[in-house]
Structure formats: structure tokens, C-alpha cells
């Protein structure tokens, strides 16, 4: 038993040494990327990104406005300037920001201004909130490429990321906590029907 414990202790020490060596070589701990998108109802956006390999966490919240610590009721009434949005933590070694942009575009109606499907109001506007200049350039390039596909102008904004306020807990992972209600809402809102019109059937 003691020899097993010693071997286990040695293994743990080696793992710690390896991690310390890796950090010393890079000069920083492993990086996690952050992406922020608004695409209408955050229940649906969160559900779509939860399916993407390389996404670590998704958080529903509010951003893009002026009110501090807004509530769902305040944002729903408009006047806060905030949009329902999702903040995504991802592993850049497993999924690129370009891939996240592609997922975003194919799960929204980019032609709708201040609305998405059955939901209307500036809180449902679509936007890409960039966190650095590289994200800004990639977002703009993807929007420009997409515009060539449509006659109508793309309404999606590309704006700097600002404070992100986490939504109430009952909104987090709503699709997993309340699958029947979520599917009922998504179907009746016409989200997937409109997405199929825009992008074709998903594989």
C-alpha cells in the first residue's frame, strides 16, 4: 500500500512539474478565449453554442447598454440599451473564433433589424461584441463576405464589448433545465423554419 501511495505521489508531482514547465515555456497559463454574441432570445443562442466542440461554457446575460446590473424585466421593457446576449468561453486550440462566427451567422436572421423571429425590440438585436482588434477584423471580414450573399443589408452590428451582466439563474441552461418549454417556445417562435429558409436544412 505504501509503495502504491508513493507511486501515486510521484505521478502527481510529475504532472505538476510538467504543468509548471509548460507555463514557464509560454510565460502564461493556457489561454481561454471569450466571444460575445447577441442573436435574439439568449436561451436559443446558448443552446446552439453548447453543441460546439471546444466551447467550455456559455452564459446568458445582458450587454451593450447603459443600465448597471439590469434585470430581465427591465431589459424586456427596453430603455436599458442592453441586448440579450451570450458570453462564450472557448478553447482556441479546439475551436477558432472564425468557426464561432460561422455558427453565429447560421443561427440568426442577419437581415432583421431590432428583432429576431417572433421577438421584437432593440433587446433582440443581433450584434457581435468584439474583445480585441483581431476579433473586430475577423467579424467585419465575415460580415462583408456574407453581405455578398444577400441583396438586403445585414443588420447585425459589430461593436466593442463592454460590461456583461449575467442574467438570472433561471435563464442559464434553460434548454437543459426546461426542455419541453424550450422546444415549445423555439418551435412557436418560428426560429428553425426561418433559419431553414435562409441557410437550408442542417446536416
Tell where the protein language model's regions lie, with residue ranges.
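Flexible coil/turn and secondary-structure edge motifs
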Residues: 2-3, 21-203
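Bacterial N-terminal signal peptides
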Residues: 9-21
